[in-house]
Structure formats: structure tokens, C-alpha cells
């Protein structure tokens, strides 16, 4: 017995397909042709497979055109074809004409898989030979074509059917729900379907009482010549005597009624088809940068005048020298103020201007010639005008002399008044003082006499008063007493001189300056010389170098084993930005609500028992549309009980079921990325240049970037300022950025961006079920057969157009960048970069050329971002050489590419003193020259030059100290003559006094 069971178990596995096949054949022989056809339709045809008692699309015979030849001419590319195997006919609807076409093969032929031709293969009994492309159902009772409202959809085109004009379209293949009556097709986005019972003959099966045939002419029932059950006699007039037909309620679910915003109707057919559609696409809103052809600019001493003609300017961003300024223009002619230091050298400037709509960006480029350092100070009452004495005009000198004279007179008057007051007071106090002093002297004399008497009495009583050794000690004590005060007096005089000496030493100290260059010497062990005299060295180093302000360079000078400079790596700062470190939150679609509903009378379809209360939020009803696409979208499913009985077109008195699906439809194919700024960090763009390469790099803290045979990174940077903005930013598909108030993740507060949150762009474009929102975003109210839905979903496109960047929020101006957002903050940063070289190759020849440099000028400002400009001219006797200028007292080193033609070069120096006079050395391969650089620099206080609607972008702080050097002008060249006269006069007076004292001393000695 056990063996028998084991044998059956072993046979069950292999025999299962055979039994399944046998059951399928049996079912096909027993079932009706309609049931077999429904079962053999594709699995995606949920609607046509819904109920075996509902009429299929094959029943609309008069509207079907059969095609037996040239099938490929009728297969248009707005469908996706798959005829599988064993299909002899393909029926499909043309959305433009509203007609049905049936591709048909002969009896012994079947359609190919792509449906384009017929192949010699007979159809099988195991699969229905009729295939319908469209998932649809039909009914016998329907309204007239005029009862259908016009199209109400966001689609522009469906295949060849043109619905509405769209300027910008996006093509997509999707399932489209449609409704059809007698060759007329309509498409709606929002609709509901109710299945009603009532005075419809299609809900009853009538039997001819005489012939017992079901082919009874139902038209006679409308004349009252039929009898039937209670439901039939309730709706129609029954004749119980000599009735032609006897009618009973069949199993058809009811008659479908479609409800739209503009009316209701009964369709002849309704379904859903996979078609190629065109959806509206929003206009590309990316900001286009273009030159401002008819704009003018004029460089003034303290501002740039800009004139715009063909558009109305709004936000602008202007950079001159090391300063970048942002603001808003009030008119077509506006001024952009700049720091005085930015006019001390020839500077290229660039202005970016946005129009009022912020959809077009224009740029204007030009150059401002330098002005004299003293001429750059154009203000009268500002601090810079009175801090630089060597820039004083004649009027200022006269004012200074007058003010000094007035101060001296005022001081003399005060001293004279104090003297008069003191003299008058002394005259009053003098008698009292004389009496008091007389009393004090009298008392002191008496006390001294008594003390002497007492002392003499004590000494007389003591023994040993006549000791011989006491005499010498008493004689030496007065000498010591006299000597000690002399030593103290000398020490006191020395301490009085100490502050003066310290002050003189402080004035004698040289000025200090941070270097913007460092040198690296190659090891001789890693150098080699080729046969043609070319030396090759490999350099490996890790060096820290301070980042220069905008428009200036930092240099890494590479030297050979002999200490001769042979190459350099230049790092020029192009700009500095305070950029948002973005943290993506979610994607937001641009949608509106969409509600789909269908009502079933009790005991019809799925409305049975407690089915309505058991209906879940993710359940599906076939009348809603294509399940795969509809249920893949974010939405919520509900079942709402409605009335039953005759008043609600139902035969059953129990409540009917209204199946509701709340979902969304796109306003356009747009999605918006919403992100917040977790922090703000500096981003410094630099140009790294060697003798053979040029690379544009971006320096970020802790993010290295590659250079030839090395890496460069931002080693340290000052703490960025706190940005008083805690809201979000958004970005559309074209890169246009905007600021907005938004919900954070898992917060779905209505009325702000983030009511719907999608994890990816693809999810937002499809409003997939991976998106998250609250079902309260759509308010719905069911009215028996229809549903009224309302929503106030925020349109991100409106927010984008209103808050497009650049924009000023509070006191901060935000500017769009390629990947993030930049904030304009008037702060100076201090940054250091790390340069790592590993096997960097330098090649050079041992030349013997000499250099001839000459100092021309040194002008500009000290302790400022722009720095001072050092101008030299240089030339070699032959060839090209790399010259190094070193100023040890200033801590400054830089390089020059010296050629055999006379050239002028300008370098930037950062100093912290007003008067400069230092010895420098200019070294070439076969020469060393000594230069003396001299100059008078000015100090420009960091005054706020902005208007009320302007903001300074962040910059880099100067490499020297900060502050005003108030005593530096004492060393100015124009004061040297004065100091020489004063010094000569004082020296003459001191010499005369010394000679007189020596002469007097000699006379006293001679007389004694």
C-alpha cells in the first residue's frame, strides 16, 4: 500500500501539465464561445474579461471593416502589436475615424507575430482565433452620439486624432480610456461609471412562449405584449393573456452610465487602448546668456555707469578687480559703486544683468584703466582722505595747519587759565600755609631738642663708648650713605630712558608681509643630464600655500639642485563663492486631481454581501481603467455605500456600492527637485598653469583635484558665515532654480511645496505609487452616480515663476549656479591650499644668460585686498631665463619670465606699511642684481560702498596684517628734509650745551 502511494506521488509531478491540458480542453468543449474568447484575450484585458454576460466589441458588426490583404498598410505606428500565435483575426479601433478594422486571414492561415502578414499555419482549438487589440465592452442600450460631451483631457494628440493644439509636446505610449457611440469617440480624464438597472430590455432574457425560442423580438415588449417576472413587470407593462414573450432578469450587471463634468450618457462601447499620445510639455525656461550688444559702460573714479536700452534690467552681478557686487537696477541707467582699491590697477570687469522676468541673462565685458593711488580717494569726509597725509591737497594742508594752530592756541589758553587760577588760589592759601608751617617748625624744634637730650642720656649710661674701632666706622658710614643715593639716581634716570629706547626700537622694526610664493629645490639624487645638455629632475613635495585674492596669483617656484629657479606652478584665483551644500529632499510633480468612480447595484458585479466594507485602499475596480497604469500611480481606493431600489435605478433594495479611485493627472510633463542647504561652504575656482598646461579647477575643503603628477586641495578655510535662511530651493528639469517654503520629509502639510513627495524624477513624472502624500489632498463627495472632487494642489510652476533666482530674501541675495545656489555675503575668507607633487618633471638647460632689471614704480594700498602694484622692466643678454625677485626684509618672492626684448611686468605685493624702501635681489642663471624698491602706499578703510539694495559677494582677505599705520608717514620722502632740519637744529643745540658745560667744568677745575 505504501508503495502505491509513493508511486502516485512520483507520478503527480510529471502528470500535472497533462491533467491541466486535459481540463483546459474539456472546459473549451463545454463553455460557450464567448466565454472561451474572453479567457483567451491578453491578461491585460481586465475589462473585456470582467463578465461573461457582457457583450464584447465583436458584437458591433456593422462598424467593422474587414481587411484580407495588405495588412501592413493598416498597421500604424501609434500601436504596439503582438498577435502571438494561432490568431486568425485582429480587431482594432481607429481613434480618428471611429471605425473598427479587422485584419483577417484565410481558413488555413494565421497572423504572424507582428500582425503584418499571414502565415501558412492553421489555428488551434486551444486558443481563440479572434484577437481584439482594444480592451473594451459594449452594450445594447446607449444614448445618441449627440449626448456625449466634447473631449476633456490634457492630451494633445492620440495617434492620428488631434484633440488640442500644444506648443510643446512630449510623446509617450500609454493606455487611454475612451467612450464610443456609433462611430464617435470621446476621451475624458475625470469620469465615473455607474451600472444602473431599470427600463432596459438588455437586462432581460425573453422566451417566445409559442416556439420556446430565445430569439424573441423584444420590440413587442415595449407595446405591452409581453409578460415576465416581478422586476420586468415593474419596469414595463405586462400582458398576462396571450403574451408573445415571457421575460426574466438576466445576469447582465446593468447598463453603464458615464458621468463627466459636463453631462452624463450611456456609451455604446467603452474601453482602454495602448496608444501613442502626445502630452503638453512646458516651455523651456532655462536662462540663456547672451551679450548685451547695445549696452554701454563708462568707468568713473568711484563707480561704473551702465546704460541699458532694449530691456528693463533687474538683478545684476558685477565684478571688478577683487570685488564682486550684486544688486538690483532701478532704471535703464544705473551706477555700480566699487571700492577705491579696485581702481588702483588696470582691471577687467564683467557685468551680468537679468531682465525683469529673469528669463534672459546678458553679459557686458570691458576694462577700467587704473588711476593714481591718491586720486582714487574721491571722498572728502571719509577716513581714507585724512589717514594718508602724503596724499593731502593744498587745502587739506592749510586746514591741518589752521587746526593745529588753533589746538596749540587752545592748549596755551587752557594752560594760562590754569596758571592764573593756581596763582590766585595760592595767594589766598599762602597766609594760612605760613602760619601752619611756622607751627610745624616750632613743634619740630622742640621735639628734636627733647630727642637729643634723651639720646645723650642713653649714650652716657652705655658702656664701651670710648671703643677705638668705632671711630673709623663712624667715618665710613657717611660716605656709604652718600654713595647709595647716587646709584639709585642713576638707575632712576635709566628707567626714565627705557620707554624712549623701546619706542625707537619699535619704529626701527621692518614691516612684515606674508609670502604668496614658496620655493622647492629638487634633490641632486633625482636629477640627470642627457647627451644634448638637458637636465631632468623629479620633484616630490607637499607644500602649503595661501590662496590669493580674486584675480591674483600664488606661485610654487621649483629650483634645480644649484638653487636656480627653473620652473613654476602658478595658481590664479578666478573667483570665490559661498555655495550651498545641497541635501535633496524629494521630487514634486505638476499635477491636478483626478477622480474615477463606478457604481454597482447590490448583487451586481463585486457588490455582494460585505464587499463594500471590505474594500481596501489599494483595491481595483475594472471599470476605472487599465489596472497596470492606474494602480501604479499614487492614489486611494474607496467604496462608498449609496442608495438602492428603484429611485437609484436598482432592483435590489439594499445599498449599492460606489467604487471611487482618487488619483492625479499631469498638468504638464514637469518635475521639480526640492532640496535644502544643510550648510554653506566656500568654493574657490582657480586656474593652475605650468609651462605646458592650463587647468581650471575648483577647490573645496577636503576634496582633492588632480594636476600633472600631483594633487591640489583646499587644506583650510575660515568658517563660513551663518545664512539667515532656513527654507528650501527648487530646480526644474531645465536647471532653473527658485526659492520656496516647503515641507520637510514625511511632512505633508497642505498649502506648500511638498504636499506630494516622490523619491526620484521618474516617480514624479509618473506620479508613481512610490510617491507619498495625504489622502486629504483631494476632497471628494459622492452624489449617487457621480463624484465631486476638489483640491488646492500647489502649482510648482507658479512658485518657480514668482521666486526665480536671482532673488533677494531678507538681507541675502541668492544666485543660481550650474549645480546649486550661491549666496552673496560681504565677508572675507582666509584659505590655504595643499599641493602634493609626486615625480613632477622639470627640464632645463644650464644657461649662462644674464638679466638686467630696473625698478619703475610701487603704488597702491597696504593692508588691502587689492594689494600694491610693483612695476619692473627686465631684459636678458640672450635667450629666455626665469628670474626670481627676492625681498628678504619684506618676505616677498616672485618670478619673472625674462626675454631678450625689453618688457614691463606688474606683480602684486601685500604689505602692511605706508612707506616702503627695501633692498631686493633679482637672480638669473648667471647674474644677481640688487634693486631698491621705494613707494608710498595709501590705506583705504573697508568702508561700506553699497546701496540699500546691493550686496558684496564673499572675497579673500589680504595676506598681510590689517589696520592703519598712523606713523608710517613719518618715514615719507617729503618729510625727510623736515626731519633733517629738525635733527640738525637739535644736534647743534645739544652740541653747544655740551661744549659750554665742558668749558665751565674746566674753569672750575682750574680755579680750584
Swiss-Prot record:
Entry-listed glycosylation sites: 34, 70, 108, 208, 691, 696, 912, 949
Lineage: superkingdom: Viruses
Disulfide partners: 138-269, 156-166, 206-247, 216-226, 233-238, 292-295, 299-368, 319-324, 514-555, 527-537, 580-677, 595-789, 601-650, 607-657, 612-639, 643-648, 728-742, 758-771, 851-924, 861-864
Stretches for region Important for correct targeting of the glycoproteins to the Golgi complex but not for heterodimerization: 461-465
Gene3D superfamilies for the chain: 2.60.40.3770, 2.60.98.50
Residue ranges, Cytoplasmic side: 416-496, 999-1008
GO biological process: entry receptor-mediated virion attachment to host cell; fusion of virus membrane with host endosome membrane; symbiont entry into host cell; viral budding from Golgi membrane; viral budding via host ESCRT complex
Annotated region (Internal signal sequence for glycoprotein C), positions in chain: 497-513
Pfam families, A to Z: Phlebo_G2_C, Phlebovirus_G1, Phlebovirus_G2
Topological domain ranges for the Lumenal compartment: 18-394, 514-977
Stated family: Belongs to the phlebovirus envelope glycoprotein family.
Identification of the protein by name: Envelopment polyprotein
Organism, as annotated: Uukuniemi virus (strain S23) (UUKV)
UniProt lineage: Viruses, Riboviria, Orthornavirae, Negarnaviricota, Polyploviricotina
Gene name tied to this protein: GP
Amino acid at each position: 500500500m505504501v508503495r502505491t502511494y509513493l508511486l502516485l506521488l512520483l507520478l503527480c509531478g510529471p502528470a500535472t501539465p497533462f491533467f491541466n491540458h486535459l481540463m483546459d480542453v474539456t472546459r473549451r468543449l463545454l463553455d460557450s464561445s464567448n466565454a472561451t474568447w474572453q479567457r483567451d484575450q491578453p491578461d491585460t484585458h481586465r475589462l473585456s474579461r470582467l463578465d461573461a454576460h457582457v457583450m464584447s466589441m465583436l458584437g458591433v458588426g456593422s462598424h467593422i471593416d474587414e481587411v484580407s490583404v495588405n495588412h501592413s498598410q493598416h498597421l500604424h505606428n501609434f500601436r504596439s502589436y503582438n498577435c502571438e500565435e494561432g490568431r486568425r483575426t485582429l480587431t482594432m479601433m481607429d481613434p480618428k475615424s471611429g471605425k473598427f478594422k479587422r485584419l483577417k486571414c484565410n481558413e488555413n492561415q494565421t497572423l504572424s507575430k507582428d500582425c503584418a502578414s499571414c502565415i501558412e499555419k492553421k489555428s488551434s482549438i486551444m486558443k481563440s482565433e479572434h484577437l481584439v487589440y482594444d480592451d473594451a465592452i459594449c452594450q445594447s442600450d446607449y444614448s445618441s452620439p449627440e449626448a456625449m460631451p466634447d473631449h476633456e483631457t490634457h492630451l494633445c494628440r492620440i495617434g492620428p486624432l488631434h484633440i488640442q493644439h500644444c506648443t510643446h509636446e512630449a510623446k509617450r505610449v500609454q493606455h487611454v480610456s475612451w467612450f464610443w457611440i456609433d462611430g464617435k469617440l470621446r476621451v475624458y480624464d475625470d469620469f465615473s461609471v455607474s451600472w444602473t438597472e431599470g427600463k432596459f430590455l438588455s437586462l432581460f432574457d425573453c422566451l417566445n412562449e409559442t416556439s420556446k425560442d430565445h430569439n424573441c423580438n423584444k420590440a413587442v415588449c415595449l407595446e405591452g405584449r409581453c409578460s415576465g417576472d416581478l422586476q420586468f413587470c415593474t419596469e414595463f407593462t405586462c400582458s398576462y393573456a396571450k403574451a408573445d414573450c415571457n421575460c426574466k432578469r438576466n445576469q447582465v450587471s446593468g447598463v453603464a452610465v458615464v458621468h463627466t463634468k459636463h453631462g452624463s450618457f450611456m456609451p455604446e462601447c467603452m474601453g482602454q487602448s495602448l496608444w501613442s499620445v502626445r502630452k503638453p510639455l512646458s516651455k523651456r525656461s532655462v536662462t540663456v546668456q547672451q551679450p548685451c550688444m547695445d549696452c554701454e559702460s563708462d568707468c568713473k573714479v568711484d563707480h561704473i555707469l551702465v546704460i541699458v536700452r532694449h530691456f528693463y534690467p533687474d538683478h545684476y552681478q558685477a565684478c571688478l578687480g577683487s570685488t564682486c557686487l550684486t544688486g538690483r537696477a532701478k532704471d535703464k541707467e544705473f551706477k555700480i559703486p566699487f571700492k577705491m582699491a579696485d581702481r588702483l590697477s588696470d582691471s577687467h570687469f564683467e557685468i551680468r544683468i537679468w531682465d525683469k522676468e529673469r528669463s534672459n541673462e546678458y553679459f557686458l565685458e570691458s576694462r577700467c584703466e587704473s588711476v593714481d593711488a591718491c586720486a582714487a580717494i574721491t571722498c572728502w569726509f571719509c577716513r581714507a582722505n585724512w589717514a594718508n597725509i602724503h596724499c593731502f591737497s593744498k587745502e587739506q594742508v592749510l586746514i591741518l595747519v589752521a587746526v593745529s594752530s588753533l589746538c596749540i592756541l587752545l592748549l596755551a589758553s587752557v594752560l594760562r587759565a590754569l596758571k592764573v587760577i593756581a596763582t590766585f588760589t595760592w595767594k589766598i592759601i599762602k597766609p594760612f600755609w605760613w602760619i601752619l608751617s611756622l607751627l610745624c617748625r616750632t613743634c619740630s624744634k622742640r621735639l628734636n631738642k627733647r630727642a637729643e637730650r634723651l639720646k645723650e642720656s642713653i649714650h652716657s649710661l652705655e658702656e664701651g663708648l670710648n671703643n677705638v674701632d668705632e671711630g673709623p666706622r663712624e667715618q665710613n658710614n657717611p660716605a656709604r650713605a652718600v654713595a647709595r643715593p647716587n646709584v639709585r639716581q642713576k638707575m632712576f634716570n635709566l628707567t626714565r630712558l627705557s620707554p624712549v629706547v623701546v619706542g625707537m626700537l619699535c619704529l626701527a622694526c621692518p614691516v612684515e608681509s606674508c609670502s604668496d610664493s614658496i620655493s622647492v629645490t629638487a634633490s641632486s639624487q633625482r636629477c640627470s643630464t642627457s647627451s644634448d645638455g638637458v637636465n631632468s629632475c623629479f620633484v616630490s613635495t607637499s607644500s602649503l600655500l595661501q590662496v590669493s585674492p580674486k584675480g591674483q596669483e600664488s606661485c610654487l617656484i621649483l629650483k634645480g639642485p644649484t638653487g636656480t629657479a627653473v620652473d613654476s606652478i602658478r595658481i590664479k584665483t578666478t573667483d570665490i563663492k559661498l555655495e550651498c551644500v545641497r541635501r535633496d529632499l524629494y521630487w514634486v510633480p505638476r499635477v491636478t486631481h483626478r477622480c474615477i468612480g463606478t457604481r454597482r447595484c447590490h448583487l451586481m458585479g463585486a457588490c455582494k454581501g460585505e464587499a463594500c466594507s471590505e474594500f481596501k485602499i489599494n483595491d481595483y475596480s475594472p471599470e476605472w481603467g487599465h489596472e497596470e497604469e492606474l494602480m501604479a500611480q499614487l492614489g486611494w481606493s474607496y467604496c462608498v455605500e449609496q442608495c438602492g431600489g428603484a429611485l437609484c435605478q436598482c432592483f435590489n433594495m439594499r445599498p449599492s456600492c460606489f467604487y471611487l479611485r482618487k488619483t492625479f493627472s499631469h498638468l504638464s510633463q514637469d518635475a521639480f527637485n526640492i532640496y535644502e542647504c544643510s550648510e554653506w561652504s566656500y568654493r574657490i575656482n582657480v586656474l593652475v598653469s605650468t609651462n605646458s598646461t592650463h587647468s581650471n579647477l575648483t577647490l573645496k575643503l577636503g576634496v582633492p583635484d588632480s594636476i600633472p603628477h600631483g594633487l591640489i586641495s583646499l587644506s583650510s578655510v575660515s568658517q563660513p558665515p551663518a545664512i539667515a535662511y532656513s527654507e528650501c530651493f527648487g530646480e526644474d528639469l531645465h536647471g532653473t532654480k527658485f526659492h520656496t517654503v516647503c515641507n520637510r520629509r514625511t511632512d505633508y502639510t497642505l498649502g506648500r511645496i511638498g504636499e506630494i513627495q516622490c523619491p526620484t524624477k521618474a516617480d514624479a513624472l509618473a506620479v508613481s505609487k512610490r510617491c507619498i502624500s495625504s489622502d486629504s489632498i483631494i476632497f471628494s463627495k459622492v452624489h449617487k452616480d457621480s463624484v465631486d472632487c476638489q483640491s488646492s494642489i500647489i502649482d510648482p510652476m507658479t512658485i518657480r515663476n514668482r521666486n526665480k533666482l536671482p532673488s533677494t530674501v531678507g538681507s541675502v541675495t541668492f544666485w543660481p549656479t550650474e549645480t546649486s545656489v550661491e549666496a552673496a555675503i560681504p565677508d572675507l575668507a582666509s584659505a590655504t591650499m595643499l599641493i602634493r607633487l609626486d615625480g613632477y618633471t622639470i627640464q632645463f638647460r644650464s644657461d649662462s644668460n644674464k638679466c638686467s632689471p630696473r625698478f619703475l614704480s610701487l603704488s597702491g594700498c597696504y593692508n588691502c585686498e587689492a594689494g600694491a602694484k610693483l612695476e619692473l622692466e627686465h631684459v636678458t643678454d640672450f635667450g629666455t631665463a626665469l628670474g626670481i625677485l627676492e625681498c628678504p626684509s619684506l618676505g616677498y618672492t616672485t618670478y619673472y619670465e625674462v626675454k631678450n626684448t625689453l618688457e614691463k611686468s606688474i606683480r602684486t605685493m601685500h604689505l602692511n606699511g605706508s612707506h616702503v624702501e627695501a633692498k631686493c635681489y633679482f637672480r638669473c642663471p648667471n647674474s644677481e642684481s640688487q634693486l631698491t624698491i621705494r613707494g608710498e602706499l595709501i590705506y583705504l578703510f573697508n568702508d561700506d560702498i553699497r546701496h540699500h539694495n546691493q550686496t558684496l559677494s564673499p572675497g579673500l582677505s589680504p595676506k598681510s596684517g590689517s589696520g592703519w599705520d598712523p606713523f608710517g608717514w613719518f618715514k615719507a620722502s617729503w618729510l625727510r628734509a623736515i626731519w633733517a632740519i629738525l635733527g640738525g637744529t637739535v644736534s647743534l643745540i645739544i652740541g653747544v650745551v655740551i661744549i659750554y658745560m665742558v668749558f665751565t667744568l674746566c674753569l672750575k677745575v682750574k680755579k680750584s
